[in-house]
């Protein structure tokens, strides 16, 4: 039976095995999907071991997406755009790297939340692997403007310099330079939720009818509490993004596109 896994640190909380099992059952695919916690200095060794054991592919989560990018012997255009990889496929000794985070996020916002991004003012918090993975697909959705904010502004500026913004106004700044700014969509791509940490964000970020979106899932994060206190019209966690990016990875591996709605509903009800 074909075997897959998710690799991260930490990874105990991951719902990816449940999601892929549901997709497999729904589509009649025979596969096994597990989770592997890699030591912080042991990602490459773990991937090599799984590849040698005959695994067909792995998903990659925090904090290994940049290492996965470097490890891949072949990269898709969207992986190159992201500079980070969350889906590896093992084929005839080669390691194919792709990134499904961005398409997962955009599909969740546009389809599941029925919230348009075109013409909107978007704030992306963070400049790590999660933010890298979603920047280009967000720009492809044609927002009016997109601001990347990060504690260290040079990381945000470097990230902005690596993409083609098209018609979107793109800028980068530190968290301390967000005062007096207003946005229609604020996306938290930092790992602050993992550490129960509140970001140093000013009051007044949310425009009327604004969406606050945290890529973390499983519980209310400090960012989501902040958004509620600040009066954000809609607040969403990253469960929909998780399911949508998993569906794209499943399609890459199996060439069958699963229906995400029943899987999301089951996870919400659990």
From Swiss-Prot:
UniProt cross-references to HAMAP family, sorted A to Z: Shikimate_DH_AroE (MF_00222)
- Into which family does the record put it? Belongs to the shikimate dehydrogenase family.
What protein is this chain from? Shikimate dehydrogenase (NADP(+))
Report the active site residues: 65 (proton acceptor)
- Give, as in the UniProt entry, the pathway in which the protein acts: Metabolic intermediate biosynthesis; chorismate biosynthesis; chorismate from D-erythrose 4-phosphate and phosphoenolpyruvate: step 4/7
Record's keyword terms, sorted: Amino-acid biosynthesis, Aromatic amino acid biosynthesis, NADP, Oxidoreductase
- EC id: 1.1.1.25
């Amino acid at each position: 039976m074909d075997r897959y896994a998710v690799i991260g640190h930490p990874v105990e909380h991951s719902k990816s095995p449940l999601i892929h099992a549901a997709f497999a059952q729904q589509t009649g695919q025979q596969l096994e999907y597990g989770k592997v916690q890699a030591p912080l200095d042991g990602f490459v060794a773990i991937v090599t071991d799984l590849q040698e054991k005959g695994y067909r592919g792995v998903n990659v989560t925090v904090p290994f997406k940049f290492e996965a990018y470097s490890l891949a012997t072949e990269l898709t255009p969207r992986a190159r755009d992201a500079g980070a990889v969350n889906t590896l496929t093992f084929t005839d000794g080669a390691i194919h790297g792709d990134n499904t985070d961005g398409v997962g996020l955009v599909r969740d916002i546009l389809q599941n939340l029925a919230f348009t991004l075109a013409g909107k003012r978007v704030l992306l918090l963070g400049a790590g692997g999660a933010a890298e993975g979603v920047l280009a697909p967000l720009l492809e959705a044609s927002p009016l403007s997109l601001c990347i904010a990060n504690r260290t502004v040079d990381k945000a500026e470097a990230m902005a310099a690596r993409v083609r913004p098209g018609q979107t106004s793109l800028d980068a700044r530190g968290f301390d330079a967000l005062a007096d700014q207003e946005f229609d969509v604020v996306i938290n791509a930092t790992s602050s939720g993992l550490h129960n940490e509140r970001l140093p964000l000013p009051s007044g970020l949310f425009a009327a009818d604004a969406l606050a979106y945290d890529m973390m899932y499983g519980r209310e994060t400090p960012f989501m509490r902040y958004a509620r206190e600040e009066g954000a019209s809609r607040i969403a966690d990253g469960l929909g993004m998780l399911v949508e990016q998993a569906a794209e990875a499943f399609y890459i591996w199996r060439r069958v596109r699963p229906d995400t709605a029943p899987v999301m509903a089951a996870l919400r009800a659990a």
